[in-house]
Amino acid sequence: MLPIYICEDDAMILAAQKKFLEKQIMIEGYDMQIALCSRHPQEIIAAVAASPKRGIYFLDVELKDEAMDGFMLGQQIRKFDARGFLIYVT
């Protein structure tokens, strides 16, 4: 099963992305699941470090009130998941 991670600082957008992806996974019967939705990049990094396997990452480009943006988060994810799929959302 392919894990999906979502990092988005806007709670409403995060919920909408999660709902949309869950619906598409169910409709299409994909072998995937939402592993973590978070508004904080450090939570995503910790989860990926704890379970470093190939995943799909939806990363907000501009993370307000955080020390890193989506591109910096992608660089950190690459340290643990070099073959993962990074999708930048703006």
Label each residue range with its predicted role:
Residues 1-4:
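Extreme N-terminal starter segment of soluble prokaryotic enzymes
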Residues 83-90:
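A short, hydrophobic beta-strand element within the central beta-sheet of small alpha/beta folds
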Residues 64-66:
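The feature encodes the CheY-like receiver
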Residues 8:
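Conserved acidic carboxylate
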Residues 58-62:
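Active-site residues of response regulator receiver
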Residues 15-19, 32-56:
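Acidic, metal-coordinating helix/loop segments flanking the phosphotransfer/catalytic sites
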Residues 12-26:
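Amphipathic alpha1 helix at the N-terminus of the CheY-like receiver
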Residues 68-83:
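Short amphipathic alpha-helix used as the core "switch/output" element in two-component signaling
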